[in-house]
């Protein structure tokens, strides 16, 4: 019931789902509703261990494996190295000989990889988020790769008629042009608590936030000149300029 259906096709799961609607849901500030690779791989691995799988399980596994094959990323690798002052730095770099990887999260609109910081705003590049989240979270993984051989055996045994052709050696979605890895994000104004226009007070917007907000209070500042003195006297305030 929670497996995401897109254009009539079963795909994968979100990291968390709403307990009432069963739709993809948010958890921590940087865990947004998404197609999630690693968690979905764990689900598929479990489903393939069930004896005598029924038609629903077969469809779920076939659908997820097709998604894993379609949206794998190739020619890339996640590099962790000592950056400035010895602080670990994580980057996504070219890796022609590397095996396929998957982003932790793919957005629900374009099915394209993204990363996120504690401000809850998705971004396309690791270097666009802070050091703490960039290095303290697994943004890319190879967990689904472990399923491909297992799936071939499972499908041949239980449902060869509907077996999906999958391969770790074919080009990924990024190299085939199915996705745009670094699509410039369109600012979603509905994602912000307050939008400030030129001539309006940024301070007034800040003071609309709770004194101790439990979630980031996001303020979008539209393009313009703001000759204002601002005092941020409460935590979890996120100021974002219109790009």
Task: Briefly describe each language-model feature range.
Residues 66, 219-222:
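Extended hydrophobic secondary-structure segments that form protein cores and membrane-embedded regions
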